Amino acid sequence: MTDLKKTQLFSAFDENENVKHGLPFTAYTSNDFFELEARQLFAKNWTFVGFAHDLADVGDVIPVHVAEQPLFLVRSAENQIRAFHNVCRHRNLKLVDEPQNCKNRITCPYHNWVYNLDGQLCAAPFFGG
């Protein structure tokens, strides 16, 4: 990625990084600016990802993307909403494709690795023996 401080995207800021005026229109259409925001803003701060009522029941799970990262939200057995990377740690396969209720576990479709609703690996069939 180019050094964005040398581009028109940062013309809205003074040398102390204070906003001089509104952002240029390219801030809303530039892939470089989006990548910068994803890395420097969204990935480092609290980010809204959904509504609690969309995860009404224990085991409800919803796939989302934040800062170009695939995640999923799940309501745990303790009635807490948790967020996890949407990949199996075995072969990096996507765990959740669509909103659903997974009951009390999330199972990888590749080798059937099983995670509980707190993200802990519970079973790894055919692994290590």
What are these regions, as identified by a protein language model?
Residues K20-G22, T26-A27, R39, K94:
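Non-cleavable N-terminal signal-anchor transmembrane helices
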Residues K6-F25:
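Short, contiguous pre-domain boundary segments
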Residues F10-S11, F34-A38, H111:
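Generic detector of well-ordered alpha-helical segments enriched in charged/polar residues
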Residues L55-G129:
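Rieske [2Fe-2S] iron-sulfur-binding domain
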Residues A27-A67:
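Glycine/alanine-rich phosphate-binding loops at beta-alpha junctions
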Residues K6-T7, F25-T29, L41-A43, G50-A52, ...:
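A short linear-motif detector with a strong N-terminal bias
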